[in-house]
Amino acid sequence: MSNSQSIKIKKPRSNENFASGSYSSRRSQQIHRLSHSPMAEGFHKPKLNISPSESNLPNNVAENTTDTPVNYGSIRDENHNSRKGKDVTLNSDEAHSENVPSTSEDPDVVRRHLGGQAADDDNFSSLQLQGGDMHRQVYRWQQEVDQNKQIRRGRSRSFSAKVSDPNLHLRSVQDMKQAGGMRRDFLRNRASSISMSSNAHGNPNFLNRNFIEFLSVYGHFAGEELSEEDEDEDTDDFAMPRDVNPSLIHSTVPSEQEPLISRHGRYKLQTPGNASNGKAVLLLLKSFVGTGVLFLPKAFKLGGLVFSSATLLIVGVLSHICFLLLIQTRMKVPGSFGDIGGTLYGPHMRFAILASIVVSQIGFSSAYISFVASTLQACVKVISTTHREYHLAVFIFIQFLVFVPLSLVRKISKLSATALIADVFILLGILYLYFWDVITLATKGIADVAMFNKTDFSLFIGVAIFTYEGICLILPIQEQMAKPKNLPKLLTGVMAAISLLFISIGLLSYAAFGSKVKTVVILNMPESTFTVIIQFLYAIAILLSTPLQLFPAIAIIEQGIFTRSGKRNRKIKWRKNYLRVLIVILAILISWAGSSRLDLFVSMVGSVCCIPLIYMYPPMLHYKACANNWILRTLDIFMFTIGAFAMAFTTYMTFF
C-alpha cells in the first residue's frame, strides 16, 4: 500500500439509498467528515475535493458540503468557506508535521473519535487496531498535542490579559442557516443586552455573594492561577482546551452537538473586575483580620506595653510601604507575584517566591492547628464533669480527620459555606473580647504590666509580622477591582484601621490580664456557658479557615510536580490525592512539634516565612522595574536591608 493514496468516488445511482449502510456509503461519509475537519496551522493540508455530482452523498448533503461546513467541535478556520469540491486525493504523508497545532483543532474532540483504549494509557499503541498503519498519523498527532500540553502545564497559568466577549462577534448568513442558528443568535444577543444594561446601572453586586469572590481571591493566591477546573466533575467534553488561542474564540461556530448553554469549561475568559471600592475594602479587611489578633495580648507581654505598641505601628507602616511597592510593580509588569519575579530576575526568583508562599502557608496552617487544639482542650476541660485535661495530640488528630477530606476538594468555591461561618464566628469572638476587656478594666483596673521586656522583646517582632501578613492577597484583590488605581489609597485606609484594631486589642487585653495573659487570650475569659460557646465557635472558625490556608500550598506543589491532569487518568488523580494527604500530615506534625510553645512557634513562622514575602521580595522587584531615580532606589535598598536584618536577628533570637 502506497503512502500517497487516491480515493475515487463513483457517481451514485438514482435508486441507491443513502442510508443503506453499504461499505461505499460509510466510506463516503468518512471522507466527507475528514474533508471538512479543520486542519491546524502548521500542517500541510491534504487535498480534499468533493463534488456534489461525483460524491456518493445525497443532494441535500452535497449542497450543504459546499455552503455550510460541518463543525465537529473544532474552532472554524476562515478557509472553510472557500472550500470547493471535485476529486478526492488523500496523501497520508502530508497529514503529519513536526509542528504541533495550537490554534484550530480541539484535541478533546479528536480524542473522542479515536478508537482503542484510553488516550492516557501509556501502553496503548494504535498499531494494535485494525488498519492501524493507515490512521497512525492521527494518533501520533494527538500524542504530540498531549505532550506539548503537559509541558505547558508545568508552570502556573497566571496570564491576566483580558479577552473580549466572544458573544459579540458578527454572525454570517451561513451561520444562521444552521439548525438552531437563529435561536442561538437570539440567546446570545439577549444575554449581551442584559449584561450591558446591568453594567450601565453601575449597581454593585450583593456584598461578596456567598463569599465566592473572597474564595476566588484564594483561587488566584498571589496572582497565581490555582484552580483545578480540569479535574472538576462538572467539566464536560465540550470544554475549550486550555492552550487555545484566545483570538480564535470569535470564530467559534456551534455545532448540533454543542449545548446552547455550555458548562463551566476549562478555559476561563478573563473578565474585567467589577468590585466597588467598598467591596475591595471589605476583602482587604478579611485578608488581614484572623487568628493573629488573639496572639497579640501574649505578644505584648513578651515585648512590653510601650515597646509593643510602637513596634506594631512601625511594622504596619513598613508593611504598607512594601504593599505599595508590589502594587506599583504589578502595574508596570503584569502577572502574578511569581511571574513578576521570573520576568525580572529569572526562574530562580520565581521558584524562591513560590517556595516562600508554600512554606508560609503551611506554617500558618500549622499555627492554626495548634491554636484550635489549645482552645478545644480548654473547652473540653471546662464542660467535662471530671475536668480532665486531655493531651493536645488528641485534638490535633481530630483535626487531621477533618482536614483530609477537605484537602481533597479541588473546587475552592465549595468551601464558601465554611468561609462564611468562619468569618461570622471570628467577628463574634473579637466583639466578645472587646467587651470583657472593657468590663475587666472598669471593675479591676490595670493589671501588672511591663513597659519593656528586655528578655523576650525579639519574639514580639515575629508575632507582629505574622499578624500583618496578607501580601499574597493584594494582587488578586487588585484584579477584581473595577478601578485598580484606587487600591493604594484604599489600602492606606485599611492599614490604618487594622493597625488601630491590633494595637487596641493587644493593649487592652494585656492591661486587663497583665502577666496572667495566656497565649490565646480568649482562654482568659471567665468560665461560663456563654464564654465556652464563644471559645468553641472561634475554634471552629479557625478550623474551617485552615483548608483555605492549605489550598494555595497544595495547588502550587501539585502544579510543580504533576504536568498531567487527573481528569481522565485515575492513577494521576490518586497520586495527587496522596500528595494532598501527605501535605496535611506534614502540617499536623509541625503543629504537634510546636504546640508546647505556641507563642514561640508563631514568632518563628513570622520571622522565617513572612519577612521574605513582605520586606525582601517587593523591594527587589520594585528596584528593577520601577526605581528610575535615586530616591526610589534608596528606598528599595533600605527596605530590603531592614527585612534581611530583621529576619536574621529574629531567627537567631528565636532559636538561640
UniProtKB/Swiss-Prot annotation:
Pfam families assigned to the protein according to its UniProt record, in alphabetical order:
Aa_trans
Biased-composition ranges, Basic and acidic residues, are 75-97
Q: Which spans are transmembrane here? A: 280-300, 307-327, 351-371, 389-409, 419-439, 457-477, 494-514, 537-557, 578-598, 601-621, 636-656
Write the record's keywords in alphabetical order, separated by commas.
Amino-acid transport, Endoplasmic reticulum, Membrane, Phosphoprotein, Sporulation, Transmembrane, Transmembrane helix, Transport, Vacuole
Q: Which GO terms describe its cellular component?
A: endoplasmic reticulum; endoplasmic reticulum membrane; fungal-type vacuole membrane; vacuolar membrane
* UniProt keyword Transmembrane helix, yes or no: yes
**Keyword Disulfide bond, does the record have it?**
no
Q: Where is the composition biased (Polar residues)?
A: 15-28, 50-71
Q: What is this protein called?
A: Vacuolar amino acid transporter 3
> What species does this protein belong to?
Schizosaccharomyces pombe (strain 972 / ATCC 24843) (Fission yeast)
